[in-house]
Amino acid sequence: MSYPADDYESEAAYDPYAYPSDYDMHTGDPKQDLAYERQYEQQTYQVIPEVIKNFIQYFHKTVSDLIDQKVYELQASRVSSDVIDQKVYEIQDIYENSWTKLTERFFKNTPWPEAEAIAPQVGNDAVFLILYKELYYRHIYAKVSGGPSLEQRFESYYNYCNLFNYILNADGPAPLELPNQWLWDIIDEFIYQFQSFSQYRCKTAKKSEEEIDFLRSNPKIWNVHSVLNVLHSLVDKSNINRQLEVYTSGGDPESVAGEYGRHSLYKMLGYFSLVGLLRLHSLLGDYYQAIKVLENIELNKKSMYSRVPECQVTTYYYVGFAYLMMRRYQDAIRVFANILLYIQRTKSMFQRTTYKYEMINKQNEQMHALLAIALTMYPMRIDESIHLQLREKYGDKMLRMQKGDPQVYEELFSYSCPKFLSPVVPNYDNVHPNYHKEPFLQQLKVFSDEVQQQAQLSTIRSFLKLYTTMPVAKLAGFLDLTEQEFRIQLLVFKHKMKNLVWTSGISALDGEFQSASEVDFYIDKDMIHIADTKVARRYGDFFIRQIHKFEELNRTLKKMGQRP
């Protein structure tokens, strides 16, 4: 192996914020200390089943062979080859199938063997152990009862530092390739663990003084600046923004990729980091910046992220949510409807792997709830199949929202919004019991204020649909409002129904002001004139499209029948 193993012997070499090695997790409570020591002994001296040893050795050999081949390709000044692609495919099979099956069989609710225990099996291969630890800690976060300890949260952070330093600080491209799915999961899990730690450190009620002191003395562990720095470094190293810019203009992205961006490892990590930044800025409540990081990605065209369905779903979820909070309802509805239709048509392919299905199914349910909110606040036509699903899931709640029930809005928002976080380290000397909820409560207040401003609009819309002309005073009387109050509400209606809407261009922030409201009006002196702008359904277009699809299918079947 030709990677610089000596550089990866100590964690301190990776990160300037290494904690003292003699730190232990003793709490002062004899029962807790005894439980911890038993757990430590069990993990240290556990007997590793023979099948797991064989799997680890095979996994290591596959990764080592790929790295050796990659070194050869780099020395020959080649970017990739069929041999590399085949070995990446083997790793993908191990990662998505073998690892999952063995986890289910041997480690369903318990950790995999520690890296130190399997190190002799892999010749203390530093790079492989970093990759193994990434999977090891991810499994603890996801499946082990009680979740990760404080020490494990810190160790996982250091392991990510090791991994990203290996990729970013190498003299030339790192001799490593991984499946796109694994690369996406690395970025996704990195942000998830940061999010989890941000909430964990705010809940001090059940923490010992020793744990709080340790958190207080290590403010740079899982610091928001470190996380942002990693994501931006991966974006810059890959030159992905420039590649996307050239790609969308019809050019060859390879021409501007640079030394690192030509390699799949850097290109895909850079791309996934853009989506990671979208997610991170959304969690921090900066929706404009969240969408701005995707300014070179054309969401309405099939692109690189289509290769990983979870990345595609995550992208649309956070873009749609950001649009919703920016009061760009028409864009939010378009984004949610598009991705829900995609999930509806491809859902069967996700059931082969449970963890993918669970993640996509959860975001699918959340996006249905967000779409229900958006359509209540801004009624417009969507795909019939999605509309039918929505009525089945949230028909009653949409009726209650139309009547102005704030409790339903709050319930659906709480269920479907991201888990917001604060980037600021709390004051450990005086942490409010609900401090971890403050970011969510702040975003809920912003959303609820907007709902309150539109509370009367649904009722006004239903009245306007009944008439073509009506004295302002008379319609105000129907609503138990004074004429002045009613005129204010009509102005609110005009204002809220006019949205900034994306029409063309690459940046999702671009757009022009439009109104898709099914009813419009103007006031002439004391008389309100109303026009129904609802467009009649064009059934002919639908049937023509279906006929073309049927003819294409018929031609395909005939060709298949002609094959020898």
Swiss-Prot record:
Protein family (similarity comment): Belongs to the eIF-3 subunit L family.
PANTHER family listed in its UniProt record: EUKARYOTIC TRANSLATION INITIATION FACTOR 3, EUKARYOTIC TRANSLATION INITIATION FACTOR 3 SUBUNIT L
Keywords: Acetylation, Cytoplasm, Initiation factor, Phosphoprotein, Protein biosynthesis
Span of domain PCI: 331-537
Chief subcellular location: cytoplasm
Family matches, as Pfam families: Paf67 (PF10255)
Role this protein plays: Component of the eukaryotic translation initiation factor 3 (eIF-3) complex, which is required for several steps in the initiation of protein synthesis. The eIF-3 complex associates with the 40S ribosome and facilitates the recruitment of eIF-1, eIF-1A, eIF-2:GTP:methionyl-tRNAi and eIF-5 to form the 43S pre-initiation complex (43S PIC). The eIF-3 complex stimulates mRNA recruitment to the 43S PIC and scanning of the mRNA for AUG recognition. (Microbial infection) In case of FCV infection, plays a role in the ribosomal termination-reinitiation event leading to the translation of VP2.
Modified-residue entries (Phosphoserine), positions: S21
Protein name stated in the entry: Eukaryotic translation initiation factor 3 subunit L
Cellular component terms per the entry's GO annotation: cytosol; eukaryotic 43S preinitiation complex; eukaryotic 48S preinitiation complex; eukaryotic translation initiation factor 3 complex; fibrillar center; membrane; nucleoplasm; synapse
Subunit record text: Component of the eukaryotic translation initiation factor 3 (eIF-3) complex, which is composed of 13 subunits: EIF3A, EIF3B, EIF3C, EIF3D, EIF3E, EIF3F, EIF3G, EIF3H, EIF3I, EIF3J, EIF3K, EIF3L and EIF3M. The eIF-3 complex appears to include 3 stable modules: module A is composed of EIF3A, EIF3B, EIF3G and EIF3I; module B is composed of EIF3F, EIF3H, and EIF3M; and module C is composed of EIF3C, EIF3D, EIF3E, EIF3K and EIF3L. EIF3C of module C binds EIF3B of module A and EIF3H of module B, thereby linking the three modules. EIF3J is a labile subunit that binds to the eIF-3 complex via EIF3B.
Gene name for this UniProt entry: EIF3L
Entry superkingdom: Eukaryota
Residues modified as N6-acetyllysine: K465, K549
GO molecular function terms listed in the Swiss-Prot or TrEMBL record: RNA binding; translation initiation factor activity
Protein source organism: Homo sapiens
GO biological process, one term: translational initiation
UniProt xrefs under HAMAP family: eIF3l
Keyword Secreted among UniProt keywords: no
Modified sites of kind N-acetylserine: S2
